[in-house]
Amino acid sequence: MEVVRGSSLVLLVLLLGALLVSQVESKSCCPNTTGRNIYNACRLTGAPRPTCAKLSGCKIISGSTCPSDYPKFYCTLGCESSQCATNSNGDAEAVRCKTACSDLCQDVDDA
């Protein structure tokens, strides 16, 4: 009984390790929030990554950095989510914050 439990535990650890490695190996980069939402909804149906990427306009990469044609979006999105999300001073303030992020990230495309 103890041998069965031990081998089951080893098998479980190996399967979890394989799952984590496959999660780390590939990443999707999407050009906008709509594309990300389409990709995520597609993946929830169980469709393969390449199919969902093609449908949504996203790219599957093996590294950790998105392609050079995506940086402005990620700069703006990161700025807005970290700086503007906690803004509780109304819509006008939120618009000013988002505009500032857009201006800050404007030169990223030229880099």
UniProtKB/Swiss-Prot annotation:
It comes from the Eukaryota. GO terms for molecular function: toxin activity. The keyword Signal applies. Pfam families: Thionin. Disulfide bonds join C29-C66, C30-C58, C42-C52. Keywords: Disulfide bond, Plant defense, Secreted, Signal, Toxin. Residues 1-26 form the signal peptide. It is found in: Secreted. GO terms for biological process: defense response. InterPro entries: Thionin, Thionin-like_sf. One of its GO terms (cellular component) is extracellular region. Residues 73-111 form a propeptide. Thionins are small plant proteins which are toxic to animal cells. They seem to exert their toxic effect at the level of the cell membrane. Their precise function is not known. Belongs to the plant thionin (TC 1.C.44) family. This is Viscotoxin-A3. It comes from Viscum album.
